[in-house]
């Protein structure tokens, strides 16, 4: 949604003429980005997985504290990117998807089990499951610090 919004702005559409309709604002309970780790790798390298998640959290914390520096770092890796545009995209993501009330209260990385169960149920309205998914097969907090990753 942020890319579409910013593309319209770049094309000269006045921002007051653009409405962004977020599915989450209308009851869709899905989670977004996730770190996916091969279960065998995680079992064999639990400390590495834990340290990686802590590093991801530190990166987010730095990006939240200084979105301009984060955008500049991105442009160093992708010279075709526009730093001002990427900073704006990052800020939109931080405001709407990263620093949520849940994350502020519970840290980053964990899930609300009731929400996750609702998300699985909502997906079943579109997809026919051969077996009912077991949420425990798709998420573990075993590699997260107690209380999640604090972004405060």
Identify the residue ranges that each predicted region occupies:
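Short coil/loop linkers at secondary-structure junctions
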Residues: 14, 80, 129-130
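Short linear loop/turn motifs
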Residues: 21-23, 88-94, 134-146
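A bilobed periplasmic-binding-protein/Venus flytrap-type ligand-binding module shared by bacterial periplasmic
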Residues: 31-47
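Short, catalytically relevant binding-site loops at active-site mouths
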Residues: 3-4, 25-28, 41-42, 59
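Conserved C-terminal helix/tail region of periplasmic/extracytoplasmic solute-binding proteins
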Residues: 116-152
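Bilobed "Venus flytrap"/periplasmic-binding protein-like clamshell domains
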Residues: 1-10, 27-32, 117-118
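Secondary-structure end/capping motifs
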Residues: 44-126
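Ligand-binding "clamshell"
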Residues: 7-23, 84-88
